[in-house]
Amino acid sequence: MTNIHTDKILILDFGAQYTQLIARRIREIGVYCEIWAWDHDPSEIAGFGAKGIILSGGPESTTLPGAPVAPQEVFDSGLPVFGICYGMQTLAAQLGGATEAADQREFGHAEVDVIAADALFAGLTDHAGAPRLNVWMSHGDHVSQVPPGFTITATTDRIPVAAMSNEDKRWYGVQFHPEVTHTLQGQTLLRRFVVDICGCQTLWTAANIIDDQIARVREQVGDDDVILGLSGGVDSSVVAALLHKAIGDKLTCVFVDTGLLRWQEGDQVMAMFAEHMGVKVIRVNAADRYFAKLEGVSDPEAKRKIIGNLFVEIFDEESNTLANAKWLAQGTIYPDVIESAGSKTGKAHVIKSHHNVGGLPQHMKLGLVEPLRELFKDEVRRLGVELGLPRTMVYRHPFPGPGLGVRILGEVKREYAELLAKADAIFIDELRKADLYDKISQAFAVFLPVKSVGVVGDARAYEWVIALRAVETIDFMTAHWAHLPYDFLGTVSNRIINELRGVSRVVYDISGKPPATIEWE
């Protein structure tokens, strides 16, 4: 079987918001890569076996004392090195060049003139055939003097060194960000570094990943049974499909129907996994327990804790009935791993980690199976399609762990959940009909616990309000509200009010993030 980890790239993270995007672009090329904090134990670099090293951007300044630096082992390794933004600046500063604060910080589109055709830039031109690239800049400092042995390969009107290289050492640097889509030929530059300069084979494909994980899972669990908390979300669904292919009936999924899921989602999950794929699924109808626990609770955090703790309690109860289960499968993905690892100094960018299954009782004593822990979300989706899951399931919008519990403002009641689930289904149905669903990042309905005066027939009505929310975003850290057509919104509003008894008004949320969050609670 092909060893898909043979050729790989190491990315040292200096805290850039785009570091994970660099890794995703490398993976899209077909090459495995890992992200390590810049202050990761340098003695492990040689043992990792990378074919090349990328130094990411970052928010620090090389002109200040104590700025993050690349370990000397990077330069002693003999490997190709590619510095991006801050990565190029520290490359210059550490190897005998100089950096300085720019008179003006540069953010956004820029034109880079290629003045020396090295292995990165040879033959690259703009649409008119000129040696010029449209790129994305995001920096305050810049390289003012290249180190000995380096050549300036690109420049702009604002900075003298937009790119540099030492071809003998195979060391390269660019001040712009090739990983973002605004840099039009950025993927070509990354491919040239990874494939042409580093010599990596493109072995990282969905089919190869599936074969690799099946072999790993079989070796890890042997003849033991595995249990999985199946939520119906993308990650757990892909884990279920992958493990079923690997170990068949040795997998048992526990699906807890909380009563807070999307419209008819419980039936859809059972139809897909139990009936169509033949996966062993235990469905626990726990709606009564959830609504009883949530009665009178309106604080969002309190609701989250109740919903999460009750899931753990129910999952524990069901696992006790499976005496042969020795392993717990989780849908942990690579960003969870990166965020949990963090940095020794705290200078690397650390985001809160989000675990698919957290706080499970210690007495369960189960080993962990995490077949997605090397994968980004987009890779998980591609695996799902390769495994035969419907595209509508694999590419659907994010849904919060507590479900409708945090889309019902205030106290959660069964009748509110049923009303909201139906309203949400109407919104999503119309988005799909209008071919808008895949053009926005997330869309959903929210139940507002306020009543509004309306007129139904000839009678006065005093009924509930439903809010619609749709956003466009790349990373969910910031988001713009989606400019949906007025006629479309009118159609959705009419359907909700006409089809759902108890709703007299529909409103559309036009708040961005920040200041608002995407979810209302």
UniProtKB/Swiss-Prot annotation:
GO cellular component: cytosol
Reaction equations catalysed: XMP + L-glutamine + ATP + H2O = GMP + L-glutamate + AMP + diphosphate + 2 H(+)
Taxonomic superkingdom: Bacteria
Keyword Protein biosynthesis annotated: no
NCBIfam families the UniProt entry points to: guaA_Cterm, guaA_Nterm, PRK00074.1
PANTHER family, A to Z: GMP SYNTHASE [GLUTAMINE-HYDROLYZING], GMP SYNTHASE-RELATED
Annotated binding of ATP, by residue: S231, G232, G233, V234, D235, S236, S237
SUPFAM superfamilies: Adenine nucleotide alpha hydrolases-like (SSF52402), Class I glutamine amidotransferase-like (SSF52317), GMP synthetase C-terminal dimerisation domain (SSF54810)
Protein's name in the database: GMP synthase [glutamine-hydrolyzing]
Domain Glutamine amidotransferase type-1 intervals: 8-203
Subunit structure: Homodimer.
Gene3D superfamilies, per database record: 3.30.300.10, 3.40.50.880, HUPs (3.40.50.620)
UniProt keyword terms in alphabetical order: ATP-binding, Glutamine amidotransferase, GMP biosynthesis, Ligase, Nucleotide-binding, Purine biosynthesis
Pathway: Purine metabolism; GMP biosynthesis; GMP from XMP (L-Gln route): step 1/1
Positions of the catalytic residues: C85, H177, E179
Domain GMPS ATP-PPase positions: 204-396
PROSITE patterns, per database record: GATASE_TYPE_1 (PS51273), GMPS_ATP_PPASE (PS51553)
InterPro entries: Class_I_gatase-like, GATASE, GMP_synth_C, GMP_synth_GATase, GMP_synthase, GMPS_ATP_PPase_dom, NAD/GMP_synthase, Rossmann-like_a/b/a_fold
Upper lineage: Bacteria, Pseudomonadati, Pseudomonadota, Gammaproteobacteria, Lysobacterales
EC number(s) stated in the UniProt entry for this protein: 6.3.5.2
UniProt-recorded Gene Ontology molecular function terms: ATP binding; GMP synthase activity
Purpose of the protein: Catalyzes the synthesis of GMP from XMP.
Pfam families on file: GATase, GMP_synt_C, NAD_synthase
